[in-house]
């Protein structure tokens, strides 16, 4: 052959790409550059490795090809390219000839990370056996294990977590791969991690656990798996939230039921002082309120001076108010602001709830510490319909507050002539 070097190199590239081992051997014997590259920066070794031409790879290595050269674009090596194409025999050969299993590409990834991302379990096992470092992190702070988790490869997860202590490793935020898997809703991965010894009660920097992560997404299967593995059901994060609190906030009734069946504390308060029932009542989640009440939730517990009933009334949640009353909530309980449920219904102008409370025999003449009655509140708000209904249900028109004022005096002070007329007709005295 009388080709010049440039032509030999071009011909070598073509021969490698087509898998022509005889022509490759001949070109190498006639002096072709064993490390020649194509327009993308791939050496002939990289091309052969990626295409799975094991014997060509062997010939190139025998001819002195640089096994650990980096491609100009993305900084890839022959081993990385072979791993990315699942070329098992080539990977074995490259490793046996000294390929650097921990070489890092432009993104900080290794051959093991590539295999983990794609789920190539045999490649992963070969690399691990050759000393691949499972703790290397890329520019996205991902490890091989994290990539296997994110891309849902449970068999790879088990392989990566065997014979090392990375299953419980935490990132800068204290997150474990178990927390990540629970958050993503990957049940198989969660099960694989648990079987590999993952600690279900490790906390991140916010004191959140895998159980809280699973609860936030409402995944009942993962929640059950974590509880079966010993997750602390009443653990509180830095805000004092438990899994039950989170389930109520997200309105996951099935999760609420599971947690209660497994022993969640129905009376526990978060750091704001809220019980699960107070949250459910405030949001008007009647179905959840019913479940909590059936589990023994205390309706008379207060936070910021409010009980479940007064919270539900103040937010206008009629079904929740009715449910609480049917369960025996104290209809005349005073909130710390001196208002009963009846007064709150009046001041918030919820006539349907107001009528319900009257029908349930709310005390229309109850006076708070300042002597104010529901009638006085209705007059002060200028709600003539509420005034008439209170009178129909027996409101005492001549009661006085601590300042000596009657409902009529309040009406006249505010120049509510229509209400003054109603009160006088009901027997109000000057």
Regions found by a protein language model. Give the residues of each.
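Ankyrin repeat boundary/linker residues
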Residues: 5, 38, 71-73, 105, ...
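Ankyrin-repeat-protein effector appendages
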Residues: 1-11, 130, 159-166, 172, ...
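Ankyrin repeat A-helix N-terminal signature
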Residues: 14-19, 47-53, 81-87, 114-120, ...
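Intrinsically disordered, low-complexity regulatory segments in ankyrin-centric signaling systems
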Residues: 1-30, 39-42, 62, 430
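Conserved ankyrin/ankyrin-like repeat signature
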Residues: 23, 55-56, 89-90, 122-123, ...
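Ankyrin repeat domain, specifically the short helix-to-loop turn at the C-terminus of the second helix
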Residues: 25-32, 58-66, 92-99, 125-132, ...
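Start-of-repeat signature of ankyrin repeats
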Residues: 8, 41, 74-75, 108, ...
